[in-house]
Amino acid sequence: MIEVGILSDTHGVIHPEIIKLMNACDFVIHAGDIVDEASLKALQPKQRMIAVKGNNDIHINSLGEVESLDLPGGNIAIEHGHLHGHIQPSHDSLRETYPNAKVIIYGHTHKQVIDKDQSPWVINPGSAGKTRNYGAAKCLKLTIKSEQEWVIEPKIFDDIFNI
């Protein structure tokens, strides 16, 4: 079994319960708008962290715009999503760009989305911080039970937290 924590749009602040959840996972994926690179130091997954540059991360030169992760049963494509529609990234455009992925992860909207209507799946963890989190910090957890069984769970945490 492999566990992947997925977050985005932290803007320098990550909810403490999300940090705990991420650090219990094998992999962590951050879909951009990190803003303060130092905030990533709190994320210590068991194996590896992957992060991409968001539209508010132009100053973070260590990150690329697109990443991918190969896991048993498929590939995960990761990008911030803002180049596929500024207000609401197009799932059709993302699927056309990454047709061979099993899952496409994007951020940008700060809204949690799990779109499994077509292949590849398109998911957005929502905002894991305080900025435009629509009432609560959010993230996703992907559990790979086997090559055929991938389970995505939405996670929602109380908005009241101090950093």
For each feature predicted by the language model, list its residue ranges:
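N-terminal active-site segment of His-dependent metallophosphoesterases
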Residues: 1-47, 57-68, 73, 135-138, ...
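Active-site neighborhood of phospho(di)ester-bond hydrolases with catalytic His/Asp-centered motifs
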Residues: 6-8, 28-33, 50-55, 78-80, ...
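An amphipathic, basic-hydrophobic alpha-helix
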Residues: 16, 88-93
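Short, conserved loop/helix-junction motifs that constitute active-site signature segments
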Residues: 43-45, 71, 96-99, 117
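Non-DNA-binding regulatory cores of transcription-related proteins
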Residues: 91-98, 112
